[in-house]
Amino acid sequence: MAFRTICVLVGVFICSICVKGSSQPQARVYLTFDELRETKTSEYFSLSHHPLDYRILLMDEDQDRIYVGSKDHILSLNINNISQEPLSVFWPASTIKVEECKMAGKDPTHGCGNFVRVIQTFNRTHLYVCGSGAFSPVCTYLNRGRRSEDQVFMIDSKCESGKGRCSFNPNVNTVSVMINEELFSGMYIDFMGTDAAIFRSLTKRNAVRTDQHNSKWLSEPMFVDAHVIPDGTDPNDAKVYFFFKEKLTDNNRSTKQIHSMIARICPNDTGGLRSLVNKWTTFLKARLVCSVTDEDGPETHFDELEDVFLLETDNPRTTLVYGIFTTSSSVFKGSAVCVYHLSDIQTVFNGPFAHKEGPNHQLISYQGRIPYPRPGTCPGGAFTPNMRTTKEFPDDVVTFIRNHPLMYNSIYPVHKRPLIVRIGTDYKYTKIAVDRVNAADGRYHVLFLGTDRGTVQKVVVLPTNSSVSGELILEELEVFKNHAPITTMKISSKKQQLYVSSNEGVSQVSLHRCHIYGTACADCCLARDPYCAWDGHSCSRFYPTGKRRSRRQDVRHGNPLTQCRGFNLKAYRNAAEIVQYGVKNNTTFLECAPKSPQASIKWLLQKDKDRRKEVKLNERIIATSQGLLIRSVQGSDQGLYHCIATENSFKQTIAKINFKVLDSEMVAVVTDKWSPWTWASSVRALPFHPKDIMGAFSHSEMQMINQYCKDTRQQHQQGDESQKMRGDYGKLKALINSRKSRNRRNQLPES
């Protein structure tokens, strides 16, 4: 058994430790930006040291490219390594428009530039791109070549007006989808930012938009995302869904509340014949609810939708919609993740319509006659095969849509509660991406949650005995050095990569880093990462098609006792024993930091050959996340301390400290600068710090030094020993210097 003796002769050096009491879960592994880079599982790209507001707007896995919009630039990055072979097009706003923007009082840095906000695939060779154009939106076609090997990336056409396709203000989000070379956008259509619209443009048919200045349709919306989603087997029944939040007045018309909403329209809607001409005749919307119900009844709402991710399946009706929500309250702050079944969303849109009635304009379910075809039905679909266009809709259908676009029922998440709730944290969630992972014990959903502090949390959803799923934070990664909020996020299950953008650049991160969990089977099993398993030699990537017998993995329970038999589990019962000295009536610190913050720590004390007993914590003996702090050390504190970590019912001893208490008077005499001993009087004049002794000598050398101290104390009254001690001190100094120089040779040079 290895012993390391730490002899405390001059004071006790203690780092200040902040103990935080928080019920919020912590990541099992936290990697800083530099630590993440050292794992060789990330890449970073930026055009310059200046922030350029990067947004990942399109991912093309067929051509192995991701397309990024930023201030005055359009980027094409290699999907396999974003730092290799980047292509860029410089596309600034015209000088005249920039000057006009400044004259209008807009921000020269964050407003008066061409911030690219729309990149959509137009055809096999071209992209359609739009930018804010210094508060004068512009669009153009960009040639990207037929194949990625062509290395073509250039604007080969004239710019055209982007009005109705991109917002004037770059700080107001624009969402868009391209269907059959037609662009569907959600944005603000005017310079002042008062006319919000869902618009179809770039079409050979007539342009169509939402009813203008009609708060029943849109009320100061902030668009979040847009998706095309099938509805049944007939392609004519497909809908475009827009996710947004809007400000709605309460029944007293005195205050405005933020509600999250889903709206949908039919792509083949051409507007009405006599009413709603060039306006959507299939526009419907419903409220999206993400709330927590307290035990005493009231609901706490996470009102503000921040991001949406669709986890698609072979059957569109089983698609899951993940949403990030935050609170709008200035008192109660938090984030939540809610999950919705697409079938539940479609059920609400097929349900009753909302109707305002009475002096207080209370919302009730519409009880009158519903016209045929049902409002919101697409022409030419399964229910209206004989109506080829919305212009054939009866007038009462169009009138009904204009006055009743809102559904009565709200859309609630699975189990009517959030999957994840974070309250009282120093961050909030901003973006989400989800991967479906096959593990040895089942299929799991892994969430990648971007924060406003430039980190990404990797969270696995765990099934529980109840109807509510559990969750475990596997990792938290600093993907940006300056903690810039994450603005966009794309995931590639095919490439097993995550792509993240912020104001300062773009980062690429692997979905897994199995080797960082440890070099033992138990470490790999405790990680509970569905991407990773123990292969008999190391923690490595798990492939469901491989030989399962040789793979050890337990995501659901994370129990090494059942998975790691035969892999030296007994080694976890023992730990190297060290000897540590403390001075009576002083403070000392017994260090013990588990690998995982999710592990619970218990301290046991064994005196002589007695049984181990749990250390009683009080104001004098305090347990911290880094160890045990003992204030005003007493003789009764002496003994063998065992630091036991427990995680998922698996216990391991991670520290054994033989703590010995020294008499304070003896230590004071030994270190007295007026002492007649040459050794003691020389301590203050040493050219090195006393704590250097701890790392400078081996165990055998420290034994020799201890013996030397003992002999010196016994002979201090003999006058002829003074000269000998001076000589021995010279040898001691030379030995320390030689050991320190050897240590420096093994260290990296300071930067």
From Swiss-Prot:
Single GO term (MF): chemorepellent activity
InterPro entries noted in UniProt: Ig-like_dom, Ig-like_dom_sf, Ig-like_fold, Ig_I-set, Ig_sub, PSI, Semap_dom, Semap_dom_sf
Compartment annotation: Secreted
Annotated Sema domain residues: 28-511
Residue ranges annotated for the Ig-like C2-type domain, each copy included: 571-655
Keywords of the record: Developmental protein, Differentiation, Disulfide bond, Glycoprotein, Immunoglobulin domain, Neurogenesis, Secreted, Signal
Basic and acidic residues composition bias: residue spans: 712-731
GO biological process terms on file: axon guidance; blood vessel remodeling; cardiac endothelial to mesenchymal transition; cardiac right ventricle morphogenesis; dichotomous subdivision of terminal units involved in salivary gland branching; limb bud formation; neural crest cell migration; neural tube development
Record's GO cellular component terms: extracellular space; plasma membrane
Position of the signal peptide: 1-21
Disulfide bond recorded as keyword: yes
Domain of life, per lineage: Eukaryota
Record region (Disordered): 712-751
SUPFAM superfamilies: Immunoglobulin, Plexin repeat, Sema domain
Major localization listed first in the record, in broad terms: secreted
Keyword Nucleus: no
Residue spans crossing the bilayer: none
Disulfide pattern: C101-C112, C130-C139, C266-C378, C290-C338, C514-C532, C592-C643
Short name of one Pfam family: I-set
Residues annotated as glycosylated: N81, N123, N252, N268, N465, N585, N586
Subunit: Interacts with PLXND1.
Family: Belongs to the semaphorin family.
Function: Binds to plexin family members and plays an important role in the regulation of developmental processes. Required for normal cardiovascular development during embryogenesis. Functions as attractant for growing axons, and thereby plays an important role in axon growth and axon guidance.
Protein name in the entry: Semaphorin-3C
Organism: Pongo abelii (Sumatran orangutan)
Gene that produces this protein: SEMA3C
